[in-house]
């Protein structure tokens, strides 16, 4: 994420400080447009996020299309870890769900680690494919 603000790392650190049950902190933003729902390059987060709250526990992440009327949260691939959680995560082999979706955070969920996500206003530009790279070059 070439244009990520340091505030994003701070938001992860704040979430770890605020939520004692949180092993791994990450960020989400509301979907940018309806095409995000079916775009496999956009990782979607399913959250236990009570109405009016700005952070909650992540239940699942997927590249697949999400259906329904609820909000679609676009995952921002920035993480903050508690030391013990990072050590356990790094020592574990890739999990079945991780291999299926090609999403490393699913290994943590399968291990029983809690991932919490804070909502941010807008996802920074991510470079995940050649079109994203061209967009980043145009902004640089």
Kindly give the residue locations of the regions a language model identified.
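Conserved core of the sugar-phosphate nucleotidyltransferase
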Residues: 4-95
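Conserved alpha/beta core of the MobA/IspD/sugar-nucleotide pyrophosphorylase nucleotidyltransferase superfamily
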Residues: 72-140
